[in-house]
């Protein structure tokens, strides 16, 4: 097929169905943009989780007897527990925090509680850094019930709750994107049907003179995929605008405090090929199936 003929057929299709083409482009842009937003949230969560996992520690709280009478972990019970922790293969580092140090650390982090929190409220503890914070349950189980142990707290459980919110946001974005994608598919199918109907005479003549089905259907496929490509371009541009005007300002304080990973333009560029593949594949497959069902002769 000559490129000039193909280009002319595609442009003719756009001119005859301007409104529907624009609607399809915008719907594709919205669905792909939401899908891209979900992918960015997933990347943000994964990168931020890595930041927090590097800081995650398990805290082994000691009983009142040890906390009140041993400020430097010199008693037999405290030494035995520390040795048991240090000899574990899954432990990277251990440090002892006596009652006074625990109180000072808590007041430094939460000064508003200085007047209501007493020193006796904070037990002594071992702060334990694990080799793999993801595998903390074995350590927690081994420590609970040991002589001198009051309780075990692992920060990863708190982090999991935090990132459950981000997981929920990404799931919501994917769900809305799916609904929009269904709308885009229906628009593509409708556009292809209308385009084929408006050019039914030309198609009939070409088939009479021996043109193959592929020869007559290719312009419709290209038309749908080109419109989808435009939609993907708008979606990517929209993500960059949102990143520049909203995320950069709204999350700047979190970035500076290294509380979450930064969403950069490189992240958007990274997901762009996948968004393009999604948009083009969705439009091309929909157009092909529509033509197979609608244009039977």
Curated annotation (Swiss-Prot):
Q: Which UniProt keywords apply?
A: Cell cycle, Cell division, Cell membrane, Membrane, Transmembrane, Transmembrane helix
State which residue ranges cross the membrane: 22-42, 172-192, 220-240, 268-288
Record flagged with keyword Transcription:
no
Q: Which domain of life is it from?
A: Bacteria
UniProt topological domain (Cytoplasmic) ranges: 1-21, 193-219, 289-297
GO biological process terms, alphabetically, are: cell division
Q: Which Pfam families match?
A: FtsX, FtsX_ECD
This protein's record includes keyword Nuclease: no
Protein's cellular compartments: Cell membrane
As for membrane topology, the entry says: Multi-pass membrane protein
Q: Which residues lie on this side of the membrane: Extracellular?
A: 43-171, 241-267
User: InterPro entries this protein is in?
Assistant: ABC3_permease_C (IPR003838), FtsX (IPR004513), FtsX_actino (IPR047929), FtsX_ECD (IPR040690)
Q: What is its main location?
A: membrane
Q: Which GO terms describe its cellular component?
A: plasma membrane
Annotated function? Part of the ABC transporter FtsEX involved in cellular division.
As for family, the record states: Belongs to the ABC-4 integral membrane protein family. FtsX subfamily.
Q: How does it assemble?
A: Forms a membrane-associated complex with FtsE.
Q: What is this protein called?
A: Cell division protein FtsX
Q: Which organism is it from?
A: Mycobacterium bovis (strain ATCC BAA-935 / AF2122/97)
The taxonomic lineage of its organism, from the top, reads:
Bacteria, Bacillati, Actinomycetota, Actinomycetes, Mycobacteriales
């Amino acid at each position: 097929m000559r490129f000039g003929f193909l280009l002319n057929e595609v442009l003719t299709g756009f001119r005859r169905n301007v409104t529907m083409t624009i609607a399809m482009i915008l719907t594709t842009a919205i669905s792909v943009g939401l899908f891209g937003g979900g992918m960015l949230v997933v990347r943000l969560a994964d990168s931020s989780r890595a930041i927090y996992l590097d800081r995650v520690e398990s805290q082994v709280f000691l009983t009142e007897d040890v906390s009140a009478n041993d400020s430097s972990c010199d008693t037999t019970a405290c030494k035995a527990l520390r040795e048991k922790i240090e000899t574990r293969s899954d432990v990277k580092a251990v440090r002892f925090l006596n009652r006074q140090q625990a109180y000072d650390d808590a007041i430094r982090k939460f000064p508003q509680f200085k007047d209501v929190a007493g020193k006796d409220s904070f037990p002594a503890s071992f702060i334990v850094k694990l080799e793999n914070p993801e595998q903390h349950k074995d350590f927690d189980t081994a420590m609970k019930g040991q002589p001198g142990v009051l309780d075990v707290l692992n920060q990863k459980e708190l982090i999991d709750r935090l990132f459950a919110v981000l997981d929920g946001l990404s799931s919501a974005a994917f769900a809305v994107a799916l609904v929009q994608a269904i709308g885009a598919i229906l628009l593509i199918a409708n556009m292809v049907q209308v385009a084929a109907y408006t050019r039914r005479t030309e198609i009939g003549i070409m088939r009479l003179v021996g043109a193959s089905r592929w020869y007559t259907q290719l312009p419709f496929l290209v038309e749908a995929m080109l419109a989808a490509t435009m939609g993907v371009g708008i979606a990517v541009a929209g993500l960059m605008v949102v990143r520049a005007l909203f995320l950069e300002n709204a999350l700047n304080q979190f970035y500076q405090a290294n509380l979450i990973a930064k969403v950069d333009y490189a992240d958007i560029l990274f997901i762009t090929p996948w968004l393009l593949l999604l948009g083009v594949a969705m439009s091309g497959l929909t157009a092909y199936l529509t033509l197979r069902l609608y244009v039977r002769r």
